[in-house]
UniProtKB/Swiss-Prot annotation:
Coiled coil: none
HAMAP family reported in the protein's UniProt record: FdhD
Active site: 127 (cysteine persulfide intermediate)
Annotated organism of origin: Cupriavidus necator (strain ATCC 17699 / DSM 428 / KCTC 22496 / NCIMB 10442 / H16 / Stanier 337) (Ralstonia eutropha)
Annotated protein name in UniProt: Sulfur carrier protein FdhD
Gene: fdhD
Annotated function: Required for formate dehydrogenase (FDH) activity. Acts as a sulfur carrier protein that transfers sulfur from IscS to the molybdenum cofactor prior to its insertion into FDH.
Pfam family, one: FdhD-NarQ
Length: 288
C-alpha cells in the first residue's frame, strides 16, 4: 500500500556519509497583523529514500531522514515483504548525494517472493500503489486482530496531550505527522515523526517490532486522518486500537470493523468519536 516515486539515479556523496538534517533554516518574509517582518523559519526536510533488498532497489519514497532503520523494518512488515522481523538480517543506511539508500538483507524466501512481485509489475509505467499488481491485492483483508486492550477514554485523550509535547520536529517546523504507542498504563512509550503520515506509522511499526512492547494491550495514536492504509498498517502491527485526531474514511471504518480494530477519530480534550468496536474504550457516561 505504498505511494512512491520513480527511482532516481543516485551517486555516492563526495562529502561522506554524514546524516542529513531533519530540518533547515530559511530567511522568510512573515506577514502578521498588518506588518511585514523578515525572520528565520525552520522548515522540515524530506529526501528520497530508496529501499534496497538484497541489492535490488524496490521503491523510492520521500521521507524525513530520521529513524530510517525503523522505517525500513516497519515498511517491510506492513507491506508483507517479510512476515516477521527476524527475516530482516541487517539494515544499513547509505547517505548519497541525491538521497539515502537503505540496504536491507532479508531471508532468501522473502526475497524470492519479492522478486516474483517485481516480475509481475515489469513493463508497467506510472507509480500509484507501487508494488501492488491487482485490485484484489490492494483490498486485501487482514486476519482479525486479537487484542485485550482496554482504555478509559480519558486516558486516550490525555495521551494525545503527551504526544503533542513530544513532537519535537513538529514544534520546530509545523510540517510533520506523528505516530505513537500508548501502553496499557497510559504512558506514551514510543513516538515517531515524518512528513508523511504513512511513513510515521511505518517507523512506529519498525520500532515496535524490535522493542519488546506488549502489542496485545496497547494502542496506536496518529496525528492525522485515519485512512484505509493506516488501519491496514495497524492490523499488520497487531494493535487492537487506532485513535486519530482527524476523521477516518468510510473504507477505513469498514476495514476496522472487519479486522476487529477499535477505531476512534476526532480525539480532543473531552471529546472523541468511535467508529468501530467501541468495547475497548471505557467511560462512565451512558449513551445519549
Amino acid at each position: 500500500m505504498m505511494r512512491c516515486m520513480q527511482s532516481p539515479e543516485v551517486h555516492p556523496a563526495a562529502a561522506g556519509d554524514a546524516e542529513p538534517p531533519t530540518h533547515s533554516t530559511f530567511a522568510v518574509s512573515r506577514w502578521r497583523r498588518g506588518e511585514l517582518m523578515l525572520s528565520p523559519d525552520e522548515v522540515a526536510e524530506e529526501v528520497p529514500v530508496a529501499l534496497v533488498y538484497n541489492g535490488i532497489s524496490h521503491a523510492v519514497m520521500l521521507a524525513t531522514p530520521a529513524d530510517l532503520e525503523d522505517f525500513a523494518l516497519g515498511f517491510s512488515l506492513s507491506e508483507g515483504i517479510v512476515t516477521r522481523a527476524s527475516d530482516v538480517y541487517d539494515i544499513e543506511i547509505d547517505t548519497r548525494e541525491h538521497g539515502i539508500a537503505v540496504q536491507l538483507e532479508i531471508a532468501s524466501e522473502a526475497f524470492m517472493r519479492l522478486k516474483d512481485r517485481r516480475r509481475s509489475l515489469a513493463g508497467r509505467t506510472g507509480c500509484g500503489l507501487c508494488g501492488t499488481e491487482s485490485l484484489e491485492q490492494v483490498m486485501r483483508l487482514p486476519a482479525p486482530v486479537r487484542s485485550d486492550a482496554s482504555f478509559h477514554t480519558d486516558v486516550i485523550q490525555a495521551a494525545f496531550v503527551q504526544l503533542q509535547l513530544r513532537q519535537e520536529l513538529q514544534q520546530h517546523t509545523g510540517a510533520t505527522h506523528a505516530a505513537a504507542w500508548l501502553r496499557a498504563d497510559g504512558h506514551v512509550s514510543l513516538v515517531r515523526e515524518d512528513v508523511g503520515r504513512h511513513n510515521a506509522l511505518d517507523k512506529l511499526a519498525g520500532a515496535l517490532a524490535s522493542s519488546g512492547e506488549d502489542i496485545s494491550s496497547g494502542a496506536v495514536l496518529v496525528t492525522s486522518r485515519a485512512s484505509y492504509e493506516m488501519v491496514l498498517k495497524t492490523a499488520a502491527i497487531g494493535a487492537g486500537v487506532l485513535a486519530a485526531v482527524s476523521a477516518p474514511t468510510a473504507l477505513a471504518v469498514r476495514l476496522a470493523e472487519q479486522a476487529s480494530i477499535t477505531l476512534a477519530g476526532f480525539v480532543r480534550a473531552g471529546a472523541h468519536v468511535v467508529y468501530a468496536h467501541p468495547q475497548r474504550l471505557q467511560h462512565e457516561a451512558s449513551l445519549a
